């Protein structure tokens, strides 16, 4: 009753999930009652012994599962052990909302019901595994559960609120600092670009700091194949953005900073399949109201950068990512569609506590 895989040596993986005859997920289990067998041993079995002895099996591999019956983690075949993570929530993330602990055998149940739900699994394999266009080492990024649920929920909310039928408020995502929001944006961009509903939209990614812009630019320009669009570019000025959008009816991913939008910014496009994704959406990207200042020369009226952005893209749908949600964020981008708190992030070993 055992499936033997023969390469340079014969190996017997504990479990293989086949889809249409392709071995897409490989499982390795260790006993929870054997003190000398750990989940890390399962990782080494996969990435050292199997990689050496039966590499052909992993030509089709999407991701791997390691488990000792208590700890259960998923990750890329190429990932270091610390980048294997538990899948702690089912499709509606109800477990965390109810405050139930998702450890031990519960984490196995949540992985099976969440990650291995048929629709979720096919969606993950199709849209949530990112391989960079170029890299000097073996890299494959598999989504974690907060990234998967956030991207899919935002995608559906954008469809619901897209202009002209909707109000253009695509929703707010509240994610703890350091939780991988840039990859969530990348996964969301892939969903939008591959959707027939949006008819090859134009995506504008907006930050409020040049270092954030540089970080996102490096990531997105190396993901053209994954996104499915060869036009992924940083915008150097308002005029550059105007030139890039002029005459464009579809497609393109453009990265810019909010400060490029001021009172001189003209209408860039009135298309409805333009999606603006704002990073750090609690800062300078929510100032839509008029400001009045009194100077020696009299009363001066002005608007913030966000007002000029919205005026230049009047029919776009706006999505906000933030680690610090405030009322103004939700006024501009809409209600919080999903959240990943610092408590969850610490529990998942994504961020660490600062104790003083």
Name what the model sees in each region.
Residues 39, 263, 269-356:
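Signature of the SF2 helicase/ATPase Hel1-core->accessory helical subdomain module
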């Amino acid at each position: 009753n055992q499936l033997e895989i023969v390469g340079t040596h014969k190996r017997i993986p504990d479990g293989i999930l086949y889809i249409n005859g392709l071995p897409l997920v490989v499982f390795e289990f260790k006993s929870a009652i054997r003190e000398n067998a750990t989940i890390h041993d399962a990782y080494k079995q996969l990435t050292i012994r199997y990689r050496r002895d039966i590499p052909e099996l992993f030509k089709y591999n999407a991701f791997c599962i390691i488990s000792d019956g208590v700890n259960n983690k998923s990750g890329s075949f190429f990932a270091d052990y610390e980048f294997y993570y538990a899948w702690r929530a089912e499709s509606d993330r109800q477990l965390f909302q109810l405050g139930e602990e998702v450890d031990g055998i519960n984490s196995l149940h949540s992985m099976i019901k969440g990650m291995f739900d048929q629709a979720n699994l096919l969606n993950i394999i199709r849209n949530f595994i990112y391989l960079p266009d170029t890299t000097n080492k073996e890299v494959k990024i598999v989504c974690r559960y907060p990234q998967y649920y956030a991207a899919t929920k935002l995608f559906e909310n954008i469809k619901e609120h897209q202009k002209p039928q909707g109000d253009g408020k695509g929703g707010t995502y509240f994610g703890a600092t350091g939780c991988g929001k840039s990859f969530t944006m990348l996964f969301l961009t892939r969903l939008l670009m591959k959707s027939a509903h949006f008819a090859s939209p134009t995506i504008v990614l907006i930050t409020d700091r040049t270092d954030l812009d540089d970080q996102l630019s490096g990531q997105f320009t190396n993901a053209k194949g994954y996104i499915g669009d060869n036009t992924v570019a940083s915008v150097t000025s308002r005029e550059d953005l105007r030139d890039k959008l002029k005459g464009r009816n579809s497609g393109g991913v453009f990265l810019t900073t909010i400060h490029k939008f001021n009172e001189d910014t003209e209408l860039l496009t009135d298309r409805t399949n333009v999606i603006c994704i704002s990073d750090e959406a609690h800062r300078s990207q929510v100032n839509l109201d008029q400001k009045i200042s009194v100077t020696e020369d009299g009363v001066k009226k002005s608007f913030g950068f966000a007002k000029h952005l919205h005026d230049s893209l009047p029919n776009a749908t706006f999505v906000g990512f933030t680690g610090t949600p405030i009322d103004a964020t939700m006024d501009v981008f809409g209600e919080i569609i999903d959240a990943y708190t610092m408590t969850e992030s610490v529990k998942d070993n994504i961020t660490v506590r600062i104790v003083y």
